[in-house]
């Protein structure tokens, strides 16, 4: 990593996104208010500008024999591999890509994959980088809560967001 050469996003971009999400979320409970408050207070330093998929979730990764195929690339509010990492973390935490198949409930295979992914993050990123990724994951949760209409899926999201937030520094409990 050549951190000195990396360009980072200005804090204002994150402040605007958080404000937009806050404005659009209806029925803010105590947990959502705490998450939004934490996002507003966060420094948002050192989020690198980079090439990014934009919507890297398990739904957008196809496996064909030994090949991985990435589909549904999209523009997001930032282009950063941190955002891609956060979206995968979001997906593993709440099994969002599998919400129609098992009501968002995890299973042994998904839990094992999630644990391997969390270990990958812990082994390859420092504490500040992981905190940035986790904070972006909180934004991912709020973004999806904004457009989710199904009450069961909304409960799934809110419960998993609370679990992540309440156990922010203990990845074993995500």
Walk through the language-model features, giving the residues of each:
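Short amphipathic alpha-helical segments that mediate assembly, nucleic-acid/protein binding
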Residues: 32-35, 114, 118, 129, ...
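Acidic carboxylate-rich catalytic motifs and surrounding loops in phosphoryl-/glycosyl-chemistry enzymes
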Residues: 8-12, 128-138
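Phosphate/pyrophosphate-binding loops and the adjoining catalytic core of nucleotide-dependent enzymes
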Residues: 1-4, 113-117, 121, 130, ...
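Regulatory N- and C-terminal appendages and interdomain linkers associated
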Residues: 30, 132-136, 140-174
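Short amphipathic alpha-helical segments and their helix-coil junctions
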Residues: 65-74, 116-128, 164-171
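An alpha-helical support segment within catalytic cores of ATP-dependent transferases
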Residues: 2-52
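Active-site activation/catalytic loop segments of kinase-like enzymes and analogous catalytic loops
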Residues: 82-125, 138-153
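Active-site acidic catalytic loop and adjacent metal/ATP-binding pocket
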Residues: 38-83
């Amino acid at each position: 990593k050549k951190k000195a050469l990396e360009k980072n996003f200005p804090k204002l971009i994150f402040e605007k996104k958080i404000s937009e999400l806050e404005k659009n979320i209806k029925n803010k409970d105590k947990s959502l208010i705490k998450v939004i408050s934490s996002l507003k207070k966060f420094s948002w330093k050192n989020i690198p500008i980079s090439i990014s998929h934009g919507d890297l979730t398990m739904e957008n990764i196809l496996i064909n024999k030994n090949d991985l195929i990435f589909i549904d690339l999209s523009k997001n509010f930032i282009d950063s591999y941190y955002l891609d990492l956060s979206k995968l973390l979001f997906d593993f935490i709440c099994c969002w890509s599998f919400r129609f198949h098992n009501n968002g409930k995890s299973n042994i295979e998904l839990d094992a994959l999630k644990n391997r992914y969390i270990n990958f993050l812990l082994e390859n990123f420092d504490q500040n980088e992981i905190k940035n990724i986790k904070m972006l994951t909180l934004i991912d949760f709020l973004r999806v809560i904004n457009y989710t209409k199904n009450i069961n899926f909304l409960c799934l999201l809110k419960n998993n967001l609370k679990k992540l937030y309440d156990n922010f520094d203990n990845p074993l409990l995500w």
